[in-house]
Amino acid sequence: MGGIPTNYYGEVISKTENNKDVIVPGLMAVGEAACVSVHGANRLGSNSLIDLVVFGRAAAMRAAKIVKPNSKHENIPESETQKSIDRFNKLRNANGKTPTSVLRDKMQRTMQKHCAVFRDAKILKEGMNEIKKPLQGMEDISVSDKSLIFNTDLIETLEFDNLIRQSLVTMASAENRKESRGAHSREDFKDRDDENWMKHTLAWQEGEKVKIDYRNVHNFTLSNEVQYFPPKARVY
């Protein structure tokens, strides 16, 4: 399942050059925002209990252990906090000609047509070109409500700013993975390929391009009390 890579305590991890996981101090991801790497390529619909209950509890216990009561937050460089403020103000004061709803509709239709469950190289490559159009449209986006109180226009624009980037990354990752696995079903690569693709995809948006790397899948247990369950074909 997709999400921010974490260890089983919910601590966010970053990949190093020697392929080892390094903890990002103080940063945690919990629930469906995280990828602990227990569900493989997919999980049954609505079955989030492991992520939410088991690892959610583990994350809470870990946070209680490492965060001292009444401790102050470490100083954050003003240059970093300013990035968030600048993004907020840029979108709030956007005076382009294209409403957010128009760009969002284009994004939704592109993802539905070009990145549905069943896909192939042709339709995904077409989708990569199409999804860049609403992304480029961010430069001409219009936010009519400039207020700071219950501004749904601004909220929807902030949401779209996130969604369009996730859409670009999703499309690129799907086009890059030359196999079928879980809910990723390629008409041109119908079989799962554990030899070449038994790994997590890591993706970074860089403008209109996507940088792709990989992270190993855990194929071991932390104790001898339970056995490792190898992946199986998804059949019903």
Where are the predicted features?
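Glycine- and aromatic-enriched mobile tails/lids
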Residues: M1, P5-A29, A33-Y236
